[in-house]
Curated annotation (Swiss-Prot):
It comes from the Bacteria. It holds the Pfam family Tautomerase. Belongs to the 4-oxalocrotonate tautomerase family. Keywords: Isomerase. Gene3D superfamilies: Macrophage Migration Inhibitory Factor. The lineage of its organism: Bacteria, Pseudomonadati, Campylobacterota, Epsilonproteobacteria, Campylobacterales. It comes from Campylobacter jejuni subsp. jejuni serotype O:2 (strain ATCC 700819 / NCTC 11168). This is Probable tautomerase Cj0270. InterPro entries: 4-OT-like_dom, Tautomerase/MIF_sf. GO terms for molecular function: isomerase activity.
Amino acid sequence: MPLVNIKLAKPSLSKEQKAELIADITELLSTKYNKSKERVVVVLEDVENYDIGFGGESVEAIKAKASK
């Protein structure tokens, strides 16, 4: 059973976009790896900007600098 965990930085996708992403990932794994769609699990997690870092700085701090 494939399990795909995708983390998305907030602000995240809309409910409709998330549903489309889940359907697309499920279709990809089903087609490419011959897996039953019913066996594919997709988990989407929204992550706060202060919980993601690039180059030693949080995304929140990077965005704050860019907006000045």
